[in-house]
Amino acid sequence: MSAHIIDGNLLSQQLRQDVATRAAALSAKGKQPGLAVILVGADPASQVYVRNKVKACEDNGLFSLLEKYEADMTEAALLARIAALNNDPAIHGILVQMPLPKHIDPTKVIEAISPRKDVDGYSVLSAGELLTGLPGFRPCTPYGCMKLIESTGTKIAGKHAVVIGRSNTVGKPMALLLLQANATVTICHSGTADLGYHTRQADIVVAATGRRNTLTADMIKPGAIVIDVGINRDDNGKLCGDVDFAAAKEVAGHISPVPGGVGPMTITMLLVNTIEAAERETN
């Protein structure tokens, strides 16, 4: 029997209705939530991502400020612009689209964003808050993955979860969020011997490697929840994830597709974080 397909578009729409309601309530008090998005350079993929984020804001009652700069913008100029936005009361979240040109240090840029406005959840402070269980902004992609898992109705506590990937933006925070939900968590990566040994024991698998067919059907425990974070292209140029979806869906209990799974949820959780930032500022 085929797995239940976890529809990220549908869940995203449901969550965005709540975002729009909360945004309207804030706007009625004269406190419309505002997100500043900065794009440096003309990377085609980044332009698409930025356009989608701005449209999501506009569709759900948030104010968006899009600032585009040439690739030769200096690091000092970018840091100065972030400092100005930090002090702008109309802006509750600041997002600098990655990747940046090579002459700009991304860590410096992320750390320049006020912790109150770090709606991407990438700063060292945000990571520390997540690690210690303090309230803070969770990175949008892992946050969205958790919502997808929760939508299956599965009780996460006591389950064995395997996260494939250890990036600062997805793998590590994903493991921490699962740990907070009382799952038993294993982190696998490029240095892991016999990946399949670990994944076959997992009730929940999150694949976040950026490599096609990292997770194949024979590596999945029957009935497991499989969340595919990857964005890749197959031999025909068609969008695909890290999981061999066609075969995996015949073994898994629940599985997220690519596209239409994690992608829309990432932008939705950015909206949620921005709303939370505005609500904190207002309260």
Swiss-Prot record:
This is Bifunctional protein FolD. PROSITE patterns: THF_DHG_CYH_2. GO terms for cellular component: cytosol. Homodimer. HAMAP family: THF_DHG_CYH. NADP(+) binds at G165, R166, S167, S190, I231. Its EC number is 1.5.1.5, 3.5.4.9. The keyword Amino-acid biosynthesis applies. Signal peptide: none annotated. Belongs to the tetrahydrofolate dehydrogenase/cyclohydrolase family. Pathway: One-carbon metabolism; tetrahydrofolate interconversion. It catalyses: (6R)-5,10-methylene-5,6,7,8-tetrahydrofolate + NADP(+) = (6R)-5,10-methenyltetrahydrofolate + NADPH; (6R)-5,10-methenyltetrahydrofolate + H2O = (6R)-10-formyltetrahydrofolate + H(+). It holds the Pfam family THF_DHG_CYH_C. GO terms for molecular function: methenyltetrahydrofolate cyclohydrolase activity; methylenetetrahydrofolate dehydrogenase (NADP+) activity. The keyword Kinase does not apply. GO terms for biological process: L-histidine biosynthetic process; methionine biosynthetic process; purine nucleotide biosynthetic process; tetrahydrofolate interconversion. Keywords: Amino-acid biosynthesis, Histidine biosynthesis, Hydrolase, Methionine biosynthesis, Multifunctional enzyme, NADP, One-carbon metabolism, Oxidoreductase, Purine biosynthesis. It comes from the Bacteria.
